[in-house]
């Protein structure tokens, strides 16, 4: 098994979602982090007050101001306003991609394509694809083998999808082993009632 399985899964997701470019990651939260770091966004972030806890934790980790919009009702995906980054962890669907967005998917427990762990970024920019893919893979360019032959490294993170997960995801997508879309309508707790310390 080699890195070509990652590109195979990227192509399968591209065809399924309608996104021209797909970057695989180890989680949706890390996909969101990569997008915000890549955009060098340093302003405030507005989230719905009901979402999974890892997203406000990430905003705190990045040192960004966080505000909650208690009137923001969402299904399947929401925007990290005012950016073009979307938490699409529960939105995986055929032809779901919207141009101009960076939509971040999850393949974790309970998600439509439940690989076990993993995420992806959908984008319409080839440049974004190459930079984000390098960032997700320790600053490595995966076509250079062995990696020790690479001379220049941009800042990278160990947020890559494992090869085994890509193979499993591709098989599940091909066999249409997706959970029912309605199973993705989850009631999250009110995050206005929590405090993040540290």
PLM features per residue range, with description:
Residues 1-11, 72, 171-173:
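A structural motif shared across PLP-dependent enzymes of the aminotransferase-like
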Residues 3, 26-29, 49, 126:
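Alpha-helix N-cap/helix-start capping motif
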Residues 7-45, 55-62:
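Phosphate-binding glycine-rich loop
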Residues 13, 31, 45, 63, ...:
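Generic structural signal for small/hydrophobic residues in well-ordered secondary structure
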Residues 20, 43, 80-82, 101, ...:
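Short coil/turn segments at beta-strand junctions that form active-site/ligand-binding loops
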Residues 24, 68, 104-106:
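Structural signal for conserved beta-strand scaffold positions within catalytic alpha/beta enzyme cores
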Residues 36-95:
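PLP-dependent aminotransferase-like
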Residues 94, 102-198:
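Active-site region of PLP-dependent enzymes
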